[in-house]
Structures are given as C-alpha cells and as structure tokens.
Amino acid sequence: MSGITAALVKELRERTGAGMMECKKALVEANGDIELAIDNMRKSGQAKAAKKAGRVAAEGIILAEVAADGKFGALVELNCETDFVAKDAGFIAFGKDVMAAVLADKTDDIEALKAKFEDARTALVAKIGENINIRRVAILEGEELGTYLHGARIGVLVAAKGANEELIKHIAMHVAASKPEYVRPEDVPADVVEHEHQIQMDIAMQSGKPREIAEKMVTGRMNKFTGEISLTGQHFVMDPSKTVGDLLKENNAEIINFVRFEVGEGIEKVEADFAAEVAAMSK
C-alpha cells in the first residue's frame, strides 16, 4: 500500500463505482497509476466506463461574452479561495475588466493578461485577503457566436454557421450539461480511439467468441463510444429522441467549435492528513 493513499482509493471509487477493496487491489497492481487501474478494472469487468478526472477544488467564476460585432467571443476563468469571495462585487468587477481587455485586444495570451492586471490583482488580494488568479482564457471567432452561463461556475462558448441565436443557445446549454469533448465523432483523436478499441477487444475476447465476432461487437461499441463523447453524436438534452447532429441537420446548421469551462476543473485540492497534523501539534 506504499504510495496508495486513502484519497487515491476514494477517487478511484468515485470514478468507477467499485468497492473499496477492489479499488485498493487495482491500485496496488497498477503501482498507484489510477488510469492504468481503471483500464485493468474495465477489462476484468469490475468497472464500466469510468468518469473523467476533474475534481472541482477551486472557487471562482466563469465569464462569457461575445464582442459587439458578434464575430469574436471569449471565456475567462478567475479563481479565488472561497465561495464567499467568488460573490464579492470587487472580485466580479475585476473579472469584467479582464474580459473587457480580452475582447478589446482579441487575445488569449494568458501571461500577457496576467502581467497587464498584476497591479490590480495585487491590490485586490490585499483588500480581500485571498489569493486571486486569472487561470485561463479561450477565444473563438466565427460567423455566429453564442454563450451560456450556468450560474457563474460553468460557461460555454459556441461558434456556429447557419444557426440562429436560439439554436446556438440551446446547443450551448447542451454542452454545459453533457460535457462533449469533441464536435464530431470523426474528430476524436486516433490515440484515444486506439486506446478504447484495445480495451473493448480485451473485454470482447473474454466472452470466448471467435475473433471475427468479437471484432464486430467492438465496432458497434466504438461507434457508441465516439458518439457519446462528441457533440453531434450525443442525444440532445432537450429532446433525447434525436441527436444534436439530427437537430443541426433539421436546421441546416453547423457547429464549427465550442469551448466549455467549469470552475476549478482539473485543479486537485491538497487534502491535509488530519491525524498527522494532530500528531505533529502534540510533539
């Protein structure tokens, strides 16, 4: 169990739905590599498709806006330490100033933005008493752009062609809810497809069926896999009887690209070992 922390076991349980002992065993066999442990658990049938990593640990806000000309849009993530500060008027105003600069300069150069706003950030940190960070910026250009904010924690920016404002808004809401990773199934990178294909072949071969039958089974599973992680292949949240691709076809529209930000995604919270803290304090 050296190097296999309780936090790692907990994360594996949350991502796979498997029991604690199965997760411990899988992590030991994978030498603490959680992604390898998930692959092995899927191959052995202990876990189905696992949830993506991305524990939300930071607080903050997402800002989303399209420029006045309608041809340029941006998302900005601004982080702080507590939910209380995320609602502070000064913090929100600082975020709006950053967004205004992004739209004015038409830039996603995060380092240049940080340098530009460092004095203002430092002053705000001194006033509020929490660290503040301009974490990331994304920009899109296109004929038709639209945004959607779910609270201030999830933001989506969509670039489309041949779509009206309402359709773009509905697509953006779908992206917020369903978290697609790519626009179309054919956009899924070859290495991602190959990785999943190998897992599915290992699972299919365990059924004892001939290889050619297993390959046919896997073809169907792979079509499902690429469809589920791509926008056009997903069932539309507002009408699951059709896919987003069907909806776009009905409206003679096309999605060029999209970006989805969620506050803190990918930032892992450093969890203190409470027992160790108490022991240290008693020395």
Curated annotation (Swiss-Prot):
InterPro entries: EF-Ts_dimer_sf, Transl_elong_EFTs/EF1B, Transl_elong_EFTs/EF1B_dimer, Transl_elong_Ts_CS, UBA-like_sf. Keywords: Cytoplasm, Elongation factor, Protein biosynthesis. GO terms for molecular function: translation elongation factor activity. GO terms for cellular component: cytoplasm. Coiled coil: none annotated. It is found in: Cytoplasm. Residues 82-85 are annotated as: Involved in Mg(2+) ion dislocation from EF-Tu. CDD domains: UBA_EF-Ts. Belongs to the EF-Ts family. Associates with the EF-Tu.GDP complex and induces the exchange of GDP to GTP. It remains bound to the aminoacyl-tRNA.EF-Tu.GTP complex up to the GTP hydrolysis stage on the ribosome. HAMAP family: EF_Ts (MF_00050). This is Elongation factor Ts. It comes from Proteus mirabilis (strain HI4320). The gene is tsf.
